[in-house]
Every structure is written in structure tokens, then in C-alpha cells.
């Protein structure tokens, strides 16, 4: 009996040892496998599909594979090795992207340019397996994905992202974007974020936290079918660049920017350029004390009938060229408070303002202006330009071309349209001394 117990005990011991060895082998194997896992992208043999993996099976994949950090050059700019470029020889036909379930265990810190110039891309599957919790850079992520019509980004964790520059730029077929879950509290760059998103008719950005954003240039540029934008919750206190922000938003009929804090903005070049449907703009709260560039700011705002710029501080502006170009329906402009002492360029400033009948520029200081080319050209209804007695004008061609109704000291002569006629003694200006000059 004792012998039998001894045998049973021995067998139990052997089983325990065997089980322990099996567990050790499995653990070793799993550990080894875990240690060799890598994030990579595999291209299908027909070059139409990219699949993102995080496993130890890269060597078994057919077709080309790239490590997740591999790059190539687009000119001098590094882009992911699998991304497409403008080089025709490098052009591929990626129509589909798949995130394998294994990829959910990977934590990228950047997704910048991941789908750069994938012009044929129509479908992205498994985005729920892309964990973006540690991503800081999403710039150019979907840049020029012009065949994409929709994107499901509800699982995107963007709490650590600082750069969204050009994230959706040139996604010309995107008809809608649900960004309600986007946490943008740390984003500093939103420049060109929706640039050239021609098909977007609406954008709900009420949840956007823009408190740290410094760059909004071209943010909505060429969003040609946007009919409205609610930006009342935008905090723009740190923004320095708003150039071309609403460039060619041709169907926007109104913009409520009363809450915009522009105290740190230095560049408003082309800010409302070609907003052809805007009928009014309330900019009374705009602080422009640090702005240096207003080139083309209201160019082609063809439906604007009036602009209240009394509160504009232009003391640091150097460029006012094209500022009101082709504002066809503007009937008046009160620029009495404009400080132009640092302006060097006024070319085409009022060109094409065919409804303006008079301009009072007696407070304009033009001592540093070097270019007045076509400054008043084709202001067909303009009859009077008031100036001060110190107006100075460099040689500038076609300054008064097409101003057929203009009369100052002399009546308009189509053969005399250059800078020599920019005076109140023998030209088309009417002298109206400033208070300082009349004392």
C-alpha cells in the first residue's frame, strides 16, 4: 500500500514538472513572439491595398512591406515610405487601406502624411484598430485623398495632438466630417486644415477648443460649397496668422466674427478673398494693431455693399495692395481713420470698385509708398478723390485707367492715366487739407 502511495506521489510530481515545463515553453515562445512584434505596412501584390499590422509575421507577407517609421523624400520633405508623392514614377493606385486587428496594440506618436497623396483611396477599414492616444502630429494625414467621400473618425483620440496642419487638405470629394469627438485642446497649428475641401457643405466645430492655436492661415480656404460656419466658440487669442483663412469660401453669406480676438494677429493677407456671397461683415471688434499685411483682404467680395472699418488700427500695416479689389457693390468707404504712414504698397487697392462714387483719402500718408499701380483703375463711377496737400506718388502705371467719371483740377483724359495725374493742381485729385495743414 505504501508503495502504491509512493508511486502516485511520484506520478503527480512528474505531471507537475511536465506542466511547468510546458508553461515555461509557452511563456518563452509568447515572450519571444512579443519581442519580435513590429508595426509595418504591407502592400498587396496588385498595389491597390495597404494593410497595417503589428505582429511578428512580416517575413511571411507577400508584396512589398515597410516599417512604420521608414521614410522617403518628397523633394526635401520626408514622407512615409508607403505614401504616394507628386513624382509620376512613384505614383501608385492605393484604393483601399486596412488596419488589421493586431494593430490595436501599437501606439504611434505620429500619423503625419500616412495617406499623403493617395489620390485613388476610396475606402479605409478598421480605423477602430488605430489607437491615436499618443499621437502628437496628424499633419497632412489625409492630404490629397481626393477620392475619399467619407471618414469615420469617431474613435480618434486627439487629446495629445498639437499639429493638424493640412490634415484634410485637398479632400475634394469629402461631403461631410463628424469631428464632434475631436479634442483639440493642445493643437497649435490648424493651418490649411480643411483647405480645398470643395464638397463640404457644413462643418460642426462647436466643440473645437482653439485656445492654443497660433496658426489658422488657409484653414477654410477653397471650401467653395460651405454655406455657413459657426465659429462663435473659437478662442483666437493666441492666433498670429489668419491669412487666406476664408479664401474663396464663395457660398458663405454671413460670418459672425464678433467674438474673434485678433490682438496678436500680424497677417490678414487675403483673409476674405473671393467670399463672393458675403453681404455684410461686422469687424468692429477686430483689433488690428499688430497687423502688417492686409493685401487682398477683401478682394472679390462682390456682394459687400458696405464695410465699417472705423476701428481698424493700421499703424503697422505695410501692404494694402489689392485690399478692396473688385468689390463691385461697395458704394462707400470711410477710411478717415486709416493710418498709412508705414504702407509701401497700394497697388490695385481700389481697382474694380465700380460702385464707389467718392473717396476721402485726405488722411492718407503716402511718404513711403513705392507702388500705386492701378490703384483706382476701373472705378467707373468714381467722380471725386479727396487728398491732402502732401500726397506723394511714385511712378505708377495705369493708376486711373477706366476712371471715366473722375474729375479734379481737370477732367478725365483716357490718354493720361499714370501717376503724374495724382495731384490736385493739374490732375484728378481734389485738395482737401487736413486739420493740421489748414492751421
What is each of the regions a protein language model found here?
Residues 1-10:
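N-terminal secretory signal peptides that target proteins for export/translocation
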Residues 9, 22, 29-33, 387-389:
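Conserved short loop/turn motifs at secondary-structure junctions
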Residues 14-28:
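Bacterial N-terminal signal peptides
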Residues 33-439:
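Negatively charged
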Residues 10-13, 244:
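Intrinsic-disorder-associated, low-complexity terminal segments enriched in Asp/Asn/His/Tyr and depleted
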